[in-house]
């Protein structure tokens, strides 16, 4: 009985390791010309959000997608091979958003900055992108936005309001690198701010009703 149980245990471990290896390998697979599916669609969406892919999203990795990937790789100092491997994906996730993440960005902008001038709405989005790219904050928009106490609109529920078209345009501009805040990581309204700490931050610029700080 002990031998039989031991054999089963070995089989389970072997199968589990094999399955894990296959899963890991699949997750790390490189997209290239000829690839197709949801991952390619996501890749195209991110490249389109960055203004590098101007075609319809097809889910097929063709010449247009390869050219867009090469442009991204050149822009961000990566090896220019036209393939979406692990390093390219890592950079894409740092400097771009997928569709659901773009929805989050638009919600933040609308709930935090509706009524602000357009540049002020872009500025709020830029702060979000700056946090994603900063080692001081989480490396994805969900964790940045829902970090405890990070955004008043999340705390008071206004985040869940439906964003308008302008919010999406501002989100797109922020993702594409427009940063009128000079790399700010925080902002506040001096008329309503209750935190003494925020006033100690070095101030970079005032846009509309918000002061943007390091």
Name each region found by the language model:
Residues 2-56:
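Acidic, Ser/Thr/Pro/Gly-enriched interdomain connector segments
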Residues 29-34, 53-59, 77-80, 94-95, ...:
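Second-shell loop/turn segments in exported
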Residues 99-214:
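Bacterial extracytoplasmic/cell-wall-associated proteins, especially those involved in peptidoglycan
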Residues 41, 86-87, 103, 122:
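A generic alpha-helix surface/boundary motif
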Residues 84, 94, 99:
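Active-site-adjacent loops and short helices of periplasmic peptidoglycan-processing enzymes
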Residues 32-40, 48-90:
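Short acidic, glycine/serine/threonine-rich helix-capping segments at coil-helix boundaries
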